[in-house]
Each structure stands twice: as C-alpha cells, then as structure tokens.
Regions:
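Gram-negative outer-membrane beta-barrel transporters
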Residues: 6-113, 190-192
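Flexible, surface-exposed loop regions and adjacent strand-edge segments
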Residues: 1-4, 46-56, 117-123, 160-170
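Outer-membrane beta-barrel domain signature
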Residues: 5-7, 72-76, 118-122, 174-178
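Residues that define the transmembrane beta-barrel architecture of outer-membrane proteins
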Residues: 12-14, 79-83, 125-129, 181-185
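Composition- and surface-driven signal marking solvent-exposed, interaction-prone regions
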Residues: 33, 46-47, 100-102, 117-118, ...
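C-terminal beta-signal and adjacent terminal beta-strands/loops
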Residues: 106-114, 135-193
Length: 193
C-alpha cells in the first residue's frame, strides 16, 4: 500500500473557445458554443501509477522504477473538443400567456476520469440532450414547466480511481467510480410576488 503525492513540474495548455447567441426571430433564440483544447504535461515524471501499471520512472536512483511518467499525456477530465447548441422558443398564446420550449444538445470528446490514467476509467465521447416545456404569464409572474435532463440516459463517468487495498487484500484490480445522474424528469412551478 502506498500513495505518491506529487505534481507536474510543467504543462502546456492552448486552445480556442467561442460562444454565440442569436435572436433568429422574435420568438426564437439560438445559442451555442465550442471549445478546442490541447493540454499536455511537458514534465511530469512523478505520477502515481494505477494498480497493475508498470512503473517507468526511477526517482531515487536505485535502478528500480517506482513511479509513472505522464510527460506527453493530457490531464484528467480534459477532452479535446466540447460543443453545445440550444434553441429557446417563446410564443405568446391567448392575451397574457406564453408557451416556451427549450432544447439543448451537449457533446464532449473522450477523456480520462482517473488521475492515474487507468485505461479502465476512460469516459467515451457522448452527446447529452435536455428539454424544457413551459406555460406561464407573459409578465413572468407565474410559470409551470416540465423538464427532462439527459434524455438519452447517458452514463457519464465523472471520476474514478483504484479501490484502496484491493490489490493487496484480494490480489485483484478493482476500481471505484462516480457517475453523473441518468435521465431525470421533473415538474417546476414558479410564482413571483
């Protein structure tokens, strides 16, 4: 059992990010954005190895590698590309009410969910869809809405790591992981006084 507490000596990050919002009509607003990111550890020789990885860095000079080199790798939770687009529709009905519909789509490339770059803990690229339908007063005083998040029920790995003591106690590799919420559907009511 052992843990290494260390940090990268240096890293390089570069990228491009853009956001936009367009009132396409009196009733439709389109929003979107994207980010392209290039992250690389330029010097990270003292990384904690995941269970089962072959160490490749000898820091104490005794001829036996103890740690893993992550030089040249990207960082945890960093995807090369992310993008989103949303459509917000607001249409007056009757004399004082309004119907609203909001649809958004989010996409991200794959990324490592583990700080030790365990290949068992890579989140594949995914697309997430969300929607909101509402009816309310045009003045904004009240509104009722139905919300649906993660309509395609994506299982998104947000963090993971080696299970402590699993290798020494049971002699087998084991991981723990945290996932974002699956599909959720809810009702929302708003009254402003």
């Amino acid at each position: 059992l052992g843990f290494n507490v260390g940090n990268a000596a240096s890293a390089t990050t570069q990228g491009l990010e853009m956001d936009m919002r367009w009132a396409a009509t009196d009733h439709l607003t389109i929003s979107g954005g994207f980010a392209v990111l290039d992250f690389e550890f330029s010097d990270f020789e003292n990384g904690q190895c995941y269970f089962g990885a072959t160490p490749d860095t000898d820091l104490d000079g005794d001829g036996t590698p103890e740690l893993c080199s992550y030089t040249g790798k990207s960082n945890q939770l960093v995807s090369d590309f992310q993008g989103n687009v949303s459509f917000d529709i607001r249409v007056p009905v009757a004399s004082s009410m309004e119907i609203g519909a909001l649809f958004d789509v989010f996409y991200t490339d794959d990324y490592d969910a583990s700080a030790t770059f365990d290949p068992a803990l890579v989140q594949d690229s995914y697309t997430m869809l969300n929607a909101r339908l509402s009816l309310g007063s045009q003045s904004g005083r009240w509104e009722i809405a139905a919300l649906a998040k993660n309509l395609t029920d994506e299982k998104v790995l947000t963090f993971g790591g080696d299970t402590p003591l699993a290798g020494s106690t049971f002699g087998a590799k084991s991981n723990y992981a945290f996932y974002s919420r699956g599909r959720t559907i809810s009702l929302q009511g708003t009254v402003r006084f």
